[in-house]
């Protein structure tokens, strides 16, 4: 619908929510035509009404008429189907009455499969008033109810489409600010696939329409306020992230409740589809969407060599894990819609603590197995998880009681027809408990399941490499949780006033999941049982249990009346044990632990029945799962415990019911009590003689309470054992929904096995009209198929149990019928030919003998087989022991050789240490000696240098004195020039030269001696360096030997010696 079609707009917050929080509705995407302006205030001044055309009625009608120009929606194809008309069930209070036209019309039915919104609204048969009693008389049009004389006050954009406060505020604003209103007629459909229409009251033409699945919320004004005669509904605007509220006013206030009741009826009802709808459905965009159901199960080591599924707390929806226990992750992937895709393999199972984790934070687990399940419906991946790994430390520490942790699991799959791998990501809550805590809870579900929607795009032929290449590429993968997180609203609800000005939200119940009539019986174990219970009832039961625990041997007085109304599901496990008298059953618990270790002769029958017990229940449907394993143990233990009866067909159903409410040990104890104390095992004894007595009693009760049905059964030759055998042997647990089964067990444990007659008569009485119309085959089919399906509705089951409880069947009457039966049997026995009786008894004994012989042969064969297997195991063990002995001797010899080698190496190492220490001391002494010699020579050289310098200085001083004296002497001055040299006297010169040559020769001799001493010193230094190099060479050889022996400590010692020696050598140089 165009934005122009809205009568008025109120500026609200721009934080509009884009999607709806329900599976029932389509995705709302953004259309950027108009964006609501931001409203930072909350008063009426800031949220004023803006009416198109300044309040002109003609302009208003024109704008509303534009709605008819909207393009057709993609999710509603043009196919039209006949819709079965359903009458409106309403209350006849006030001046309103219902009238449906006789003409049947054709409505367009959307092909999108929607789950109906939840709502609980009481529906009572209406009492028709006269048509002229009110101008608001509904008129049926297009399978709908039409209400006239309504005033349309306008519409506005809202940010919180399910907020009652926001809706009432908008209703008040629109009512107070609307000056010119528009009279309309409102057409409300009777089914959830219909469309709400606004009609012109004059011309009966359509002004606007709103599909029911787009209407999110209905509300009416509070009593005592000006808006008490108004109602409104919010709808998701087509192709925009806008939610709009439409407000109406009724001339008669009482009409508001009738209109909201019509909306409630539309929410609840679903039109019956004709067979043509399946064949005429065109291809939708969903044909490229493949839905997968992915389940996660966590198993822990139970200490017995097996892995058992951990329990799941339904209140917190979290797994309960034990700290430090090895675990396994099991993933079940099952495709639920579209063409089947072949899963080729799994190449990765990953785990990480936390929520919304990155791919880099995921840690790979070791894969143990992958492949199709035994039934071929799902692909199973199993991986081992070591919680002690540092990566998983967060989920291996005990969690406080008031907190939970998140854990993310991912599985990567290769699908044959898909071009790239697909990853399914599961986020779950977990709580870590102490490893010593016993996790016994009768939870029916120990796995978590998530639905994924994989959208694929087919690759064109020219884009493929070859014909065998993949056919699809992934467009997007989205989980159901992600869809819900993007949605902003819950399922539609209707608000109705209560006393005063208060109003309450009444959610609509899910649509009855009615299946088409077929010959398939209802699967056992069907029907979800809610743990919700009124607080007052829980308080009453709490007080009763407190009193009961004070004296467990005496039942409280009000117990029977409370049990008749049903025991709260959360308390059934405890109450059943108290009713059965299992408060002191330690001996049975210990007995059970011993019995499960023994072999049962009826093992094959038990295994066969286990696979057929409660296939519709999640806890028992998996072959080899925890549920079937526990059920097998209980049945096997009882077959060994009760040797006279053993296991009889049907006991598994009763055991399964008990196992859903208590651990194995307690379930076994209650089963024993029911079989022995309540007399159920008597039905299986003496060729079912007591069971036939029960059939006779039932037929006599039918003759008294339902004589016409009794006579009809006689006419069609239908006997009680043909339809009631399963009722008595399984206590109604085999075919009926679980909430009805649990209630029957409540009554049986409280009042005894005679309750079966009450329930059986109740079933026959409520089905009398149908059974009277059947023949022999039809009656059997009715008991097998139609009768259990009739009680899929919990309301029908409650009515049946009320009828059964109100039936008064005295024990005196049952005793009387029992005596009649035994008298009749005695008469038959007396009238019977003794020869025939003996022949029959003989045949029975022969059959028993043959059966025992067969069992003997089977046991003998099993014994021989066991002996052969044990002999084989013993031979294998002996061979393995011989091999281990040989290996042990070889290992001992290797150990002796290794010890000798160790001693030899230790001796060599000690010798090498001593040699190195000796050479090191010698080298240190020589280095010290050389150092002292070098120091002495350095001192001598320095002294000679100082002495030479002193002599030169003294000579210069003496020459200077002589020159001064010569200059002062007039006679001698003539012999010397200005530079101090002799002018011409050769003799003097010779004398002086001679003296100078002698002095030089003396100095040269002294210098030559010093050079000789220095050369000798250098020679000694070179010899010392040669010795040091020789020592270093010896050290290198020793180091190589140590390295060859791989003695690291000696290597470090030699390295330190070498380093010290090298440093000292350099200092010496």
UniProtKB/Swiss-Prot annotation:
PID domain mapped to chain residues: 142-298
UniProt keyword Cell cycle present: yes
Modified residues (Phosphoserine): 42, 360
SMART domains reported for this sequence: PTB (SM00462), TBC (SM00164)
Keywords: Cell cycle, Coiled coil, Cytoplasm, Cytoskeleton, GTPase activation, Phosphoprotein
Site (Glutamine finger): 649
Positions in coiled-coil regions: 798-1047
Residue ranges, compositional bias (Acidic residues): 510-520
Domain named Rab-GAP TBC: residues: 566-752
Ranges annotated as spanning the membrane: none
Gene Ontology MF, one: small GTPase binding
Disordered: region residues: 1-79, 482-527
Site (Arginine finger): 608
Alphabetical list of CDD domains matching this protein: PTB_Rab6GAP (cd01211)
Lineage: superkingdom: Eukaryota
InterPro entries, per the entry: Kinesin-like, PH-like_dom_sf, PTB/PI_dom, Rab-GAP-TBC_dom, Rab-GAP_TBC_sf, Rab_GAP_TBC_domain
Sequence positions bearing Phosphothreonine: 996
Localisation: Cytoplasm, Cytosol; Cytoplasm, Cytoskeleton, Microtubule organizing center, Centrosome
Record field: compositional bias (Low complexity): 7-22
Primary role: May act as a GTPase-activating protein of RAB6A. May play a role in microtubule nucleation by centrosome. May participate in a RAB6A-mediated pathway involved in the metaphase-anaphase transition.
Subunit structure of this chain's protein: Interacts with RAB6A and tubulin gamma.
PANTHER family hit by this protein: RAB GTPASE-ACTIVATING PROTEIN 1 (PTHR47219:SF6), RAB GTPASE-ACTIVATING PROTEIN 1-LIKE (PTHR47219)
Entry domain remark: The arginine and glutamine fingers are critical for the GTPase-activating mechanism, they pull out Rab's 'switch 2' glutamine and insert in Rab's active site.
Name the UniProt record assigns to this protein: Rab GTPase-activating protein 1
Gene source species: Pongo abelii (Sumatran orangutan)
Gene name for this UniProt entry: RABGAP1
